[in-house]
Amino acid sequence: MSSRHLACLLLLLSASAARAAEPPAQWLVTTDLWGNPAYQLLTLPDQQGPVQGRFDGDPLQGTREGDTLDFVVTGSDGATYRFRAEQAGAALRGTADYPDTNASERRALHPFSARRLPERPAGGPRQHDFVPTSYANEFSPHRAPVLTVWPGDSVRTTTLDSGGVDAHGQTRALFGNPQTGPFFVMEAEPGDVLAIHIKRLRLNRDYADSLDSIVGRALTPTLAAKATGLDKPVRWTLDRERGRARPETATGKLKDFWVPVRPMLGGLAVAPGFGNAPISTGDTGRFGGNMDFNEIREGATVYLPVSQPGALLYLGDAHALQGDGETSQYALETSMDVEFSVDVIKSRAQSAPRVESATQLMVLGQGGSLDDALRAATAGMAQWLEQDYGLSLSETAQVLGSSVSFVVANLAGRSVGVAAKLDKALLQQVERVPGTPRGSR
């Protein structure tokens, strides 16, 4: 073999090895199931000829010839799904041949498209500065992501108040807890848990708005009869230098009344899963939502179960201060500067939102009644203790019976919230399950 032929052969082998070493491309696939978009992840190498990969966690095999891609996915139940697409740069478009949902012997064709997801930039976790230009009034999987981030990345951004007003007093969005986002978190898939670390919350204006109200759930008939003149707006002055707030036009008994601020996020959510309609930013669920839990503040880590590729994280409805339950219907509603980072916990079951501070584990139960919310909080805490500490139900009952505290987190929404709290210092006496995730310390 001549030296020229040898050099060419080595060059080809080197190029082939380099392609083999490249990570497979990731695509976000949108399949139109009779007008209902389903979002799934496709992992596939860029090579020509035979290809293998995964679609929504299931294995696939196929071929790529030029810009034409054919592959078959085999589901865990043995069902097959056949895809054919044409690639144009970072986009795929084609048809998916699925089993008919009502008759397994029949097939149904569905159009689909896909966009190629970006590769992680070199250099490790990054700091992103994001200035929002539009806001969401639904927790929806259909809204285009405003930013793509990776586990370990941090984001600095801002939120509006619940009325859609920004730091300069300008109305920027429709009232009703407009949210910043969604943020697409790479590596987050359905069945995972998204950990959101609240690194910084800062007031960015000198006032907040509230009401002189008491929510109906907190009123006796006698008190309700006296409260007919309430529900009037109350503006609060925020002294950012001293970290305190007072009713702006207070007279009489409250003319010298000041309270220390304790900034928090009322809204924090990921997108609901397939089959669920987009959810109002005033509502809550296991995905988070308008939780109005005053422990979601600087230094806390919030854990939310992921139901869509990329999680699709929303945040907003910041409060300068809120008492337990948000009994005035509106807390001290204001805009906020926010910094957060994200991590992904793979393949972890979680029934309800969790919050971890430096000193406590907290589970937020939500339901149509306080009884239902209490049950959800108790079940969620029992699940956490079993997962992270390996406790049996008997052992969990002993820990809860001796040490748990319950607080009413929210009374102002369509559903109510009850939080179960445990001091982490007590649990230092119990050995953790090796490898379980840790949040705030």
Region roles according to the model:
Residues 7-15:
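Bacterial N-terminal signal peptides
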Residues 21-89, 93-103:
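Central antiparallel beta-sheet cores of small beta-barrel/beta-sandwich binding domains
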Residues 121-171:
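N-terminal, Lys/Arg-enriched amphipathic/low-complexity engagement segments
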Residues 131-140, 172-179, 279-287:
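Short, structured beta-strand/loop micro-motifs enriched in basic residues and often containing a Trp
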Residues 162-173, 201-211, 310-320, 409-412:
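Short, Lys/Arg- and Gly-enriched loop/turn segments at beta-strand edges
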Residues 203-296:
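Intrinsically disordered, low-complexity linker/loop segments enriched in Gly/Pro
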Residues 261-290, 294-371:
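Conserved mixed alpha/beta catalytic, RNA-binding, or beta-rich assembly cores of soluble enzyme
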